């Protein structure tokens, strides 16, 4: 199930993201804070994914009533945006190395983040959560390519290329791990179970390239895919392409 950031009330979402109206101004000291609710939601999403995440489930985790949660969070849509922004806060700005080293750091940091919080891959952020961590992330990503002779739109496009590649590659990796978990079989076991019948159904002469390359990949990786190695290969090629662009200026 895909969630969409920006699906909640824009005003209430921004208030949550930036800590406005953190708690009621009058009355007894509340049992909860918005930050505690967000942390609980992230713990649950890490363990169970977004599909089972609900205000009721979060309330159970915190030992309060659902209405207590609604005092701080209007609904799941707004909460998801805050969860994304908080997760982005785990990312670290790149150091002062070359532009290539800075972009490589950004790609690897994003790749690692998606593996720590796979539920991020269930969220489409075409309308990004405009919180402090998201804004800071975009700022230091742009700084990584500032001063290279690129136009502003090109700078944005380079950042989108690198982060989009990291997200796409992480999705393959996370999905491969999930397939193994759900099936109870490794890739190698799955191919071994499929091979006997497959050999009777497929004529190698009809698919000479697929047969040859598939065999080479299987021998090299022990499976049909190797997400980590694909990430390394793809990242190098992405950076090579950016280098060609920068060199043309």
Sequence positions of predicted segments:
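A structured, mid-to-C-terminal "fold-capping" secondary-structure block
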Residues: 2-3, 185-249
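Hydrophobic alpha-helical connector segments
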Residues: 92-136, 152-155, 159-162
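N-terminal intrinsically disordered/low-complexity leader segments
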Residues: 1-31, 208-218
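Alpha-helical structural segments
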Residues: 36-43, 78-93, 105-112, 136-143
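Hydrophobic alpha-helical bundle segments that form small-molecule/ligand-binding pockets
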Residues: 137-165, 169-196, 242-246
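Helix-turn-helix
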Residues: 36, 40, 44, 48-77
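Amphipathic alpha-helical interaction segments
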Residues: 36, 57, 78, 105, ...
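Amphipathic alpha-helical segments used for helix-helix packing
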Residues: 84, 111-133, 140, 171, ...
């Amino acid at each position: 199930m895909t969630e969409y950031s920006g699906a909640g009330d824009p005003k209430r979402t921004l208030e949550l993201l930036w800590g406005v109206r953190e708690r009621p101004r009058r009355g007894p000291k509340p049992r909860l804070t918005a930050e505690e609710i967000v942390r609980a939601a992230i713990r649950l999403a890490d363990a169970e994914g977004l599909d089972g995440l609900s205000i009721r489930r979060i309330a159970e985790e915190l030992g309060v009533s659902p209405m207590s949660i609604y005092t701080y969070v209007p609904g799941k849509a707004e909460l998801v945006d805050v969860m994304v922004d908080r997760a982005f806060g785990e990312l670290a700005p790149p150091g002062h190395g070359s532009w290539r080293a800075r972009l490589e750091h950004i790609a690897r940091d994003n790749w690692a983040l998606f593996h720590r919080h796979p539920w991020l891959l269930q969220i489409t952020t075409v309308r990004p959560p405009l919180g402090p961590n998201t804004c800071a992330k975009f700022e230091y990503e742009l700084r990584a390519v500032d001063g290279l002779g690129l136009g502003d739109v090109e700078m944005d496009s380079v950042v989108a290329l690198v982060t989009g590649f990291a997200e796409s590659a992480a999705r393959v990796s996370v999905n491969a791990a999930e397939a193994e978990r759900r099936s109870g079989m490794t890739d190698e076991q799955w191919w071994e179970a499929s091979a006997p019948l497959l050999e009777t159904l497929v004529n190698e002469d009809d698919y000479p390239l697929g047969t040859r390359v598939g065999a080479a990949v299987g021998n090299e990786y022990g499976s049909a895919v190797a997400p980590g190695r694909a990430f390394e290969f793809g990242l190098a090629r992405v950076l090579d392409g950016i280098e060609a662009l920068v060199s043309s200026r």
